[in-house]
Amino acid sequence: MKEIILATSNPGKIKELEQLLAPTICIPQADLGIFDAEETGLSFIENAILKARHASSLANKPALADDSGLVVPSLNGEPGIYSARYAGRKANDEDNIQQLLSKMADLSQEQRQAYFFCAIALMQHAKDPTPIIATGIFHGIISVKPSGTNGFGYDPVFYLNEYQCTAAELPAKIKNRISHRAKALNQLRALLPD
């Protein structure tokens, strides 16, 4: 892959994808005047396909979309596919984190288990009948308060026992090796034709 459209407007995702996909030339959809597709799917995979197809159809080029989010089993999978808008459509990362911490205030350590799930869809063209789908999972625990300034989204409350810090305290070099997005992209690379 020499050039690909990134079907996202999320600056954090764009930065991570550009780092993880190098040396591929990544063109954020906004650079081409493409707005986000409406996420009407019922799963991360459905939403990734919708977003990749939308960007590919408008750019007339291959497009890659990532739909990912935080899953907390003790909250019946919340925030799940609604991770970016957990505290409402106009919410920012801090609002979403506060909503999550509020819902988890009375939960025990065992009930604070969580994971990030990433689904990546690569469409060679808008009518691609066989998009390449890859997934990755990143396990952790939801901390009781935010810590760290790296990353984005729920990273400041996503605690990693193995590293004794949150994802927001990890250096990008380490996070880009172990995260759900890194795992999904590694799987995608293995699925790409030579």
From Swiss-Prot:
Coiled-coil features, chain-numbered ranges: none
One cellular component (GO) term of this entry: cytosol
Catalytic activity: XTP + H2O = XMP + diphosphate + H(+); dITP + H2O = dIMP + diphosphate + H(+); ITP + H2O = IMP + diphosphate + H(+)
Entry-linked PANTHER family: INOSINE TRIPHOSPHATE PYROPHOSPHATASE, INOSINE TRIPHOSPHATE PYROPHOSPHATASE/HAM1 PROTEIN
Function noted in UniProt: Pyrophosphatase that catalyzes the hydrolysis of nucleoside triphosphates to their monophosphate derivatives, with a high preference for the non-canonical purine nucleotides XTP (xanthosine triphosphate), dITP (deoxyinosine triphosphate) and ITP. Seems to function as a house-cleaning enzyme that removes non-canonical purine nucleotides from the nucleotide pool, thus preventing their incorporation into DNA/RNA and avoiding chromosomal lesions.
Protein family: Belongs to the HAM1 NTPase family.
Protein name: dITP/XTP pyrophosphatase
Biological classification of the source: Bacteria, Pseudomonadati, Pseudomonadota, Gammaproteobacteria, Legionellales
